[in-house]
UniProtKB/Swiss-Prot annotation:
Pfam families: Spermine_synt_N, Spermine_synth. This is Polyamine aminopropyltransferase. Belongs to the spermidine/spermine synthase family. The gene is speE. The keyword Nucleus does not apply.
Length: 312
């Protein structure tokens, strides 16, 4: 195997004692914005990637695992609850890849992406076309540079799905308020009857799952149904959790044939086939392992503005 002559290691810590290292071969953009530290770079093995505050958000090699898992289970849930995903709100999502996945749905008439950091959005638009694939220019898409909490307070309850594609909820970062009970109540009030909400919900590895269990437990104090699930993408160094929430029931054993039929009816074939999500994959994702089920059941902490997520 050929090793580049010039590179340096980008280290990402998961605990004070554990980190992963990824080789950076070229820096495409670096800056400290008003909200966070941003790096867009070419890596040795995983293509281009976005790093915020020292944490990888996505790389071109495996971002499809994350973005398909974030978007399509939620929109399938809307259909299964008797709705049609016409209006979708994305919170965060600077790379434009979440936007890309939403725009696969032919029923979508309007998708608004709200991100607090316009500098990061513009850098991703310039340097990560492999991720957004021109989605920012789609006439159905609108990008709003604003605080998601403020935007939600002003919007009407018109949304069929709200997708939270935010950086990790650390108190020093811009997103920690968006993982609290107060915020989840705001989200619920802005959804249509058959609407669904999905959130990136932290790592689910055995020594890191406390944040995930608290997010899921907090959601359960607000929504009638919550389905946790997780993916493994090498960029993140371990399993990463999500939580899907709705007022209608969410089947933990979705019928693969029905899911495949929904996807076939609603996805635009001109935008290419999904690489990760299908009926069998969704069924597998929803089978939460025993240790995680027990940890969620035992969780008692509720994230609030008075008791927000913190680094532990």
């Amino acid at each position: 195997m050929n090793t580049p002559k010039s590179f340096f290691w980008a280290q990402e810590y998961f605990t004070p004692w554990d980190y992963t290292a990824r080789a950076i071969t070229r820096i495409l953009a670096y800056r400290k914005t008003r909200f966070q530290e941003m790096l867009i770079a070419e890596t040795g093995a995983y293509g281009k990637g976005l790093m915020l505050d020292g944490h990888w958000q996505s790389t071109t090699a495996d971002e499809f695992l994350y973005h398909e898992a974030l978007v399509h289970p939620a929109l399938v849930q809307v259909v299964q609850a008797g709705g049609i995903p016409r209006r979708v709100l994305i919170l965060g999502g600077a790379e434009g890849a979440t936007l890309r996945e939403v725009l696969r749905w032919r029923s979508v008439e309007q998708v608004v992406m709200v991100d607090i950091d316009g500098e990061v959005v513009e850098a991703c638009r310039e340097h990560l076309p492999e991720m957004h694939q021109g989605s920012f220019a789609d006439p159905r898409a609108e990008v709003v540079i604003a605080d998601a909490l403020d935007f939600l307070g002003q919007t009407e309850p018109i949304w069929d799905a709200i997708l939270s594609d935010l950086s990790d909820p650390v108190e020093a970062g811009p997103a920690y308020r968006l993982f609290t009970q107060e915020f989840f109540r705001q989200v619920r009030s802005k959804l249509q009857t058959a609407g669904a909400f999905v959130i990136q919900a932290g790592p689910t590895g055995p020594v890191e799952l406390w944040q995930h269990t608290r997010i899921v437990h907090t959601l359960k104090t607000v929504f009638a149904a919550v389905q946790p699930y997780a993916i493994y993408a090498p960029t993140y160094g371990g399993p990463l959790g999500f939580a899907l929430a709705a007022q209608d029931p969410i089947s933990s054993r979705p019928e693969p044939e029905q899911v495949d039929q929904i996807l076939a009816q609603h996805l635009d074939p001109d935008r290419g086939a999904l690489r990760f999500i299908d009926g069998i994959t969704l069924l597998g994702l929803y089978q939460v392992p025993a240790h995680l089920r027990r940890a969620i059941a035992a969780e008692t902490t509720v994230y609030t503005l008075a008791n927000p997520p913190q680094v532990e």
